[in-house]
Amino acid sequence: VAYGRVDTCSMLENAVAHINNFRPNVEAVIITGDITDRGELEAFHVFREIINELVPPWYVVPGNHDSRENFLEAFKDCYYLKNGSDFIHYSVDDHPVRLIGFDTTVENKPYGFLTEERLLWLDNCLTEKTQKTTILFQHHPPFCTGINHMDVQNLINGKELIQLLTSHRQVRH
């Protein structure tokens, strides 16, 4: 239950049922963070109980409400999270398009920020496979959305990300 009043569990259960019944079949589900309200491990476990009912594979990155430590504990069995980095980013080539999950979070802060290390990782990852269409997913948008209370929590250096992406044609934006 988020914010003490919204039954997010029922909403997630309904979404999972809808995705599982969707035709044509959904090939993958991308989850871009804020899985929990306050980062509690128990909340991650509740999420896992529900999301494990999904038929298609699912891929997840943390949001600013998610504790990195508890996130990694809750998803330690997800093969794609085994990158050995301090940040939670990865690439998956199991689909017709390449998926890159990218960690934009700053622990205990609402906004996102990409260190040079993270930007270099992404640049190297994108340079590896230039011919395969790629979907990059992350929690914080790199641009203003027009939602004022969200735009103050955006990706602080989003322009740097957009600049990097312009040199990689396989990521459409």
Description of each model-found segment:
Residues 1, 26, 97-106, 141-144:
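Short, basic/glycine-rich phosphate-binding loops at helix/coil junctions
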Residues 1-2, 69, 108-111, 144-148:
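A short acidic, helix-capping loop that chelates divalent metal ions and anchors anionic groups
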Residues 36-37, 66, 142:
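Short active-site segment of divalent metal-dependent hydrolases/proteases
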Residues 129-145:
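Short acidic, glycine-rich surface-loop motifs adjacent to enzyme active sites
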